[in-house]
Amino acid sequence: MNKFCLLPFHGKRIGVANIPFTILFKKGPCFLHSHITAVYYSTKGKNDSHEQSRVSKKSTFTPLETPWYLRIVDNEKELMEGKKNNHHTMNKELEIPKTSPNSLRKIADLLTGKLGLDDFLVFDLRKKSPNSVSAVNKLGDFMVICTARSTKHCHKSFLELNKFLKHEFCSSAYVEGNFNERQESRRKRRLARKSNLSKLLGRSSECSAKDLNSEAWYMIDCRVDGIFVNILTQRRRNELNLEELYAPENEKSKFQNIDSGNVPTISGVNEISSNNNILLGLRRLAQQRRRYSTINPNGLSNLRYFLQKEDFKGANKIIQSSSGTETHNIRTLEHVKNTLKDLVGQERKVDVVQWKSLFDEHSTFLTINQSAAYWPLRLEYAILLNKADPQFYSDRVFLKDYLLLKKSLGQELIREDLIALLEMVLKTQHSSHSYFNLVKQNRVIIRALNLFKGLQTEDDGSVVYDEEVISLLLNSMVADERVKLRSLYETIDHIFQTFGDKLTSGMIVSILQNLAKIKDWNKLLQVWEAITPTEGEGQDKRPWNEFINVINQSGDSHVISKIVNNGHLLWIRRLNVNVTPELCNSIKALLKTAGMENSTLEEFLVRGTNNQ
């Protein structure tokens, strides 16, 4: 052990005690030991005696095992080792569907290994039930969700994933949520403009631009085996909670956002900062909608008075002055609808444009309960507008104003919506029954049918295969004897292949009527014979009464004589058809037209059946 001492020094008029300082050097860390002597000095004359009072106090410092600056490297090593261990355990616990393709495993290894994305989840969308089909099931088979550390990490991960897909699978990914420099500059200008407007309105928007730029969501279509990859920042993932959307029905409860209130969203930050502004709170209190009604008892009668006169300015004033609860708003719209119904029933000419704008202006979409009461009301109102002026509120307007609007707002279309459109198509009158006008109508129907794909009726059948829907569809394909769509025969064949022996009487009658309308008697008889039962007697449930009426109403003597002379009516006795009074009258009328009234055939078909 080496010892180094500092010698004491003397000063004038100061009594100093020897203060030895000793520094000990060892092989380990160095420590400082000191023996401190307290000194009192005087400013009196030279002759004054020096009064010295020595109070010695020893203080020792407890040595640390390892200084902080020597622990930095060790802590970093432990942190790196912990990350490696977590990464290995995460790879071991990585769950991928068993029947998934090898490409999904390669993409998962890239995301969790090289790119360092966390919280990796894979949802298999192939096993979804038909009742819970969404747009995602139509697009892909596997949905991947993972978390990035920042927006730059999201962008870098997308670039690396795109390079990997090009190299491994010769596929270029499609991404949503990636902003280029021009879009980012445009976004910043909008945020700056929004912040300026917020300052004028007394709102605080200090953190809005910063918060929006610090969160990201990249949705990537790999275009490989139906794989979609979602890369999100942690806060954005907590806000969106995509896991609950993609999870199966029996596992959605596992991903419900229970602690979502603790996540500080962007809107929440702005709301907290704005609530601290007292003036803003007073302004919001003054501008908020009242949740009580101030309408007088005669309000509805006054509204009806203005609507009957078509004074829409006065009607608007009454509705705005009485705006209250959601139930009251629905009741007001019902009153408007009933007034229009009375005017249309009286065949009065109404201003359809003003009536439509009045209903749209006071329509709201606030809650699920209100939407459930609103859409049937809007459907009835649209039918009344079409009845009042089919040229203005045509089938094309109904498609955009009702069907597309309802679908875009997340509401489910129902059977009555499609029937209403088909009835409007049939009511639309053109100046001439040309083939091109019929094609235009058919295009509207095709666009509407695309909206109803995958929708089921109460009987677990497709809405498109409903009996009334099929009847209206067939009627829309025929204008007259000369004008018909070329797809009519293909549609009839498709109906026979789809239903087979389960064809209903309504479908058969609709097919017969449309074939009789175009006077294709050979196809009509071919269809009628194709549905003849073969299992034995007593099984013939074909609509004989409607079949005979269609033949008789044609007035074609050649067709009628062919039906009678070729023995088609004899199948009534052979298959023991239940001859009702209506069928008896139809047989008599047909034989009378054929000139065989009171004949042996009539007695055999009608009277012989009555004797049984």
From Swiss-Prot:
GO terms for cellular component: mitochondrial inner membrane. It is a peripheral membrane protein. The keyword S-adenosyl-L-methionine does not apply. Signal peptide: none annotated. Residues 1-14 form a transit peptide. SUPFAM superfamilies: Nucleotidyltransferase. GO terms for biological process: mitochondrial gene expression; mRNA stabilization. InterPro entries: Atp25, ATP25_mRNA_stabil_dom, NT_sf. Its main location: mitochondrion. It is found in: Mitochondrion inner membrane. Keywords: Membrane, Mitochondrion, Mitochondrion inner membrane, Transit peptide. Gene3D superfamilies: Beta Polymerase, domain 2. The keyword Mitochondrion applies. Belongs to the ATP25 family. mRNA stabilization factor specific for the 0.95 kb OLI1 mRNA. Also involved in OLI1 ring formation. This is ATPase synthesis protein 25, mitochondrial. It comes from Saccharomyces cerevisiae (strain RM11-1a) (Baker's yeast). The gene is ATP25.
